[in-house]
């Protein structure tokens, strides 16, 4: 009897340990999120006035507050028009009256049981930004987990929780600007695209399957690709200038399809993901158009669906060109040069035939993403100015985590040299990170975007440290006892 009891207890203990190993990250992630919210809600009392008069930090917060009030009275409609800007005629302002304001009002509607009071609306608005900042830990964790396992994901969540700088200062109570919700939805869009391209690599969709309408073989990559397109659309809906992520994805697909073809892999797999995801984005952003004749990046107009459609078409064209290249027996090494020449030609034609669209795409890309050629208007806006010293700025923002991120990028790039698989999502993270670094060097406000890459890529760095020191974390203390002194010193220094 005692033996049977011991076996049952041993089995129960083993089952508990296995469950804890599989799910321990959830309570840890929950604690991290609570900590992020708690830190940002410390100054709540400063914004609770005796007479109930709203008090916000920053100027743009008041624009959102007026939009939120109007939306609450006319729910679910929003007002992308600012009557006090250019008074008395007012003007369209695409960055206000977005999904962000609608989400806050929806939360207030739930709390206020369909009829929120002014006080309820104000309280929800005060707490919305800290909540959204805390939620950033979720997509950051899952992105980090894809690069460095569960431990890497938790490292990513801890990095973003402990990071000070602009991401913290722009997401505290009293701030009502869209600066906190932008990183949240960008992180969701990037994670969704990571999942989609991995599904494309795994399921290997090709043109023949589409021609034969073999939906059973195409279902999984198609679903994940559409979801990635939806996530990208939500990001643009929150911030119309988020169309820059469409451009980043476009560069990624151009690089990845070229790499695949040169390595002897069919570009159809990733081209399918690009065409479906960006095609879905083109359709959905068309439904969001508020200024049909506008190609500006700050309004929901033609730019977003047109650029998404161009990227989708570009993916299809590159896959078609690869097949033609094979049919003619041309050397694969010349394919990248052909793609580069065609892109340059397309930009030249756009500059000559569609100068307005060229300026909206290339001009805005240079203005926001390349640390040269800033406009005089940008230089008069504090947050749009380039940092005086980039490396001093990133050290103030992220400490040594920025440099461990660079090491993580190096580890990702060197994976093939060590016989380890280099996946498409690795290319995506590398391209995206390089763009975020360039953006942060262009406008100081984009430091609150760079924090995403710093946190996520540190997961790869942490995973490589574990691999380097051969730490088997699941086997207990055995491997830790085998550590040499120099290895412990190295970890402490890092």
Predicted regions and their residues:
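Membrane-interface helix-loop-helix junctions at transmembrane boundaries of multi-pass membrane enzymes
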Residues: 218, 264-269, 329-339, 357-361, ...
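Start-transfer (signal-anchor) and selected internal transmembrane alpha helices
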Residues: 1-50, 59, 135, 140, ...
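Perimembrane helix-loop-helix junctions
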Residues: 206-215, 219, 245-333, 464, ...
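Active-site lumenal/periplasmic loops and adjacent helix-entry segments of GT-C-fold
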Residues: 41-187, 198, 204-208, 240
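Juxtamembrane membrane-water interface segments that cap and precede transmembrane helices
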Residues: 112-117, 288-300, 362-398
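Hydrophobic, aromatic-rich transmembrane alpha-helices
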Residues: 253-254, 316-325, 341-352, 399-420
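Hydrophobic/aromatic-rich transmembrane helices and adjacent perimembrane loops
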Residues: 427-430, 435-478
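Membrane-embedded helix bundles of polyisoprenyl
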Residues: 34-36, 128-146, 150-216, 220-258, ...
